[in-house]
Swiss-Prot record:
Gene3D superfamilies: Acetylglutamate kinase-like, PUA domain. Belongs to the glutamate 5-kinase family. This is Glutamate 5-kinase. Catalyzes the transfer of a phosphate group to glutamate to form L-glutamate 5-phosphate. One of its GO terms (molecular function) is glutamate 5-kinase activity. It comes from Corynebacterium glutamicum (strain ATCC 13032 / DSM 20300 / JCM 1318 / BCRC 11384 / CCUG 27702 / LMG 3730 / NBRC 12168 / NCIMB 10025 / NRRL B-2784 / 534). GO terms for biological process: L-proline biosynthetic process.
Length: 369
């Protein structure tokens, strides 16, 4: 798997705030650190890979200019810091890549962008065109307009979504930790975990919170790595200090093995990025049919319609106890579905005998465990 990552053609590289700022105050962008990172990125690109960078650090970079000594928690202050810091951050990225004659392109995304299929496609096209034109895409969450509860939460998840969005061959998550340990790596009894093949390898792992200037701790990195690996993308998790060997031969850090069958772009989007408009509760038989049998969802297996939604919107599919089993694109609006609950297909009027959610537009979590 490490060879697969080292030979990957299209790679998304995520760099955390702590890897871009200096050690003294933790909220000043360090040009030397960025230069070191860019040197390694350039070497990988010269070897033939396409790279997309997901860069944290906007809020941290805006703290010093605004006289903030601690990371802001108030949304408006955080957004102000991001607005100031993003300018500083992109300036440093631009200066560093200019040493190699490479332009950069800023791509700011929100969860709302990823949640709408047309916006997600536009972002994908922009990133692809930047690469074709020889520019390095630098992606970050648009903190100045993102709102609490409608955001990615951290750039680790954003990186996983971008990796699938651009059909990446590998995702490299860089922070200030050498890889995954079963407990805090400062504990002398902590054991390093080299490979994660499935959830069993994570049993007993204790993942802590984020650092002083970032939002994504080890828990978020593990979550993002599993998200990407479930969608078919191998992941390497290591420290920014190891970026050279990480991009050269991937013989450092922790590798998360991908699922064998890569999710289609639509199914990944529906499961992990799309906005949902309502919910549909199923009986046990319908749950079995759509999760294990790969069947379309029929009206006969539905017990409850929750919320108001339109035909073509994405809804959550629930089991009898309310557990979320998947998501799908509905063929009918909620008012129409209310009249169809529990009915056999042959008893429905003409024009209402299509599946409620066709198997091609139904993605379940059980198959990605």
């Amino acid at each position: 798997m490490r060879e697969r990552i080292s030979n990957a053609k299209r790679v998304v590289v995520k760099i955390g705030s702590s890897s871009l700022t200096n050690d003294e105050d933790g909220h000043t962008v360090d040009p030397n650190r960025i230069n070191t990172i860019v040197n390694a990125l350039q070497a990988r690109m010269e070897a033939g890979s396409d790279l997309i960078v997901v860069s944290s650090g906007a809020v941290a970079a805006g703290m010093a200019p605004l006289g903030l000594s601690t990371r802001p928690t108030e949304l408006a202050v955080k957004q102000a810091a991001a607005a100031v810091g993003q300018v500083h951050l992109m300036h440093q990225w631009g200066r560093s890549f200019a040493r190699y004659g490479r332009p950069i392109g800023q791509v700011l995304l929100t969860a709302a962008d990823a949640g709408k299929r047309d916006r997600a496609r536009n972002a994908q096209r922009t990133i692809d065109k930047l690469r074709i034109l020889g520019a390095v895409p630098i992606v970050n969450e648009n903190d100045t307009v993102a709102t609490t509860g409608v955001n990615f939460g951290d750039n680790d998840r954003l990186a996983a979504i971008v990796a699938h969005l651009v059909s990446a061959d590998a995702l490299v998550l860089l922070s200030d930790v050498d890889g995954l340990f079963d407990k805090n790596p400062t504990d002398p009894t902590a054991k390093f975990i080299s490979e994660v093949r499935d959830g069993n390898d994570l049993k007993g792992v204790i993942a802590g919170d984020g650092g002083k200037v970032g939002t994504g701790g080890m828990a978020s990195k593990v979550s993002a790595a599993r998200l990407a690996s479930r969608s078919g993308v191998p992941v390497l998790l290591t420290s920014a200090a190891n970026i050279g060997p990480a991009l050269e031969d991937a013989q450092v850090g922790t590798v998360f093995h991908p699922k064998d069958n890569r999710l289609s772009a639509w199914k990944f989007w529906a499961l992990y990025a799309a906005d949902t408009a309502g919910k549909i509760r199923l009986d046990d038989g319908a749950v079995e049919a759509v999760t294990s049998g790969g069947k379309s969802l029929l009206a006969v297996g539905i017990t409850e319609i929750i919320g108001d939604f339109q035909q073509g919107e994405i809804v959550e599919i629930l089991g009898p106890a309310g557990q979320i089993i998947g998501r799908g694109e509905v063929s009918y609006d909620s008012d129409t579905l209310q009249s169809m609950v529990g009915m056999q297909t042959q008893d429905l009027p003409d024009g209402m005998q299509r599946p409620v959610v066709h198997a091609d537009y139904l993605s379940n979590y059980a198959s990605r465990a």
